[in-house]
From Swiss-Prot:
Gene: trbH
Name of this protein: Probable conjugal transfer protein TrbH
Keyword Cell membrane in record: yes
Species in which this protein is naturally found: Sinorhizobium fredii (strain NBRC 101917 / NGR234)
Keyword list, A-Z: Cell membrane, Conjugation, Lipoprotein, Membrane, Palmitate, Plasmid, Signal
NCBIfam families: PRK13835.1 (NF010409)
Lipid-binding residues (covalent, S-diacylglycerol cysteine): C17
Length: 148
């Protein structure tokens, strides 16, 4: 009888550890950021990336070719910080003192805000923005994740 009671208690406790069938859900959706908002977000994220990855004289940044306003604004912002940006996949000859850094980016809509993320093999940056017709303003602190 005692073993039966222990079995029921064990089953009751373990049943509380089960997850729902649907698993985790997110409300993140890819979104399009245009015009002044794209420029404001790209400019802010490019400046934060420049603070983290070092001087532009020793680095070439490679990003995937994209026709979105944000991609164009990000490329222009990085060039404004003095970085050489390659978008066609053809790096050409890179000097021995110049480091090639692959940069990934994403723009997602989350709860009425825009989540911008930039990532390299060594660091990832993320920040939420509130987009307006006149531009965009940061809605969260900058998130920095350094990889070893």
């Amino acid at each position: 009888m005692r073993k039966l009671l222990i079995s029921f208690v064990t089953v009751a406790i373990l049943s509380g550890c089960q997850t729902a069938e649907d698993g985790l859900t997110t409300s993140s959706t890819p979104t399009t950021v245009t015009g002044p908002a794209a420029s404001a977000i790209a400019g802010d994220m490019a400046s934060r990336l420049a603070e983290q990855i070092g001087p532009s004289a020793t680095m070439t940044i490679k990003i995937e070719k994209d026709s979105s306003d944000f991609a164009s604004a990000l490329e222009a912002a990085l060039k404004g910080w003095g970085y050489t940006v390659v978008t066609d996949g053809k790096v050409g000859r890179v000097g021995k003192d110049v480091k090639l850094v692959e940069l990934g980016y994403s723009i997602d809509g989350v709860d009425g805000q825009v989540l911008a993320r930039l990532s390299t093999p060594s660091i990832a940056l993320g920040r939420a923005y509130t987009a307006t017709a006149a531009g965009a303003v940061p809605a969260s602190p900058l998130s920095i994740m350094q990889r070893n």
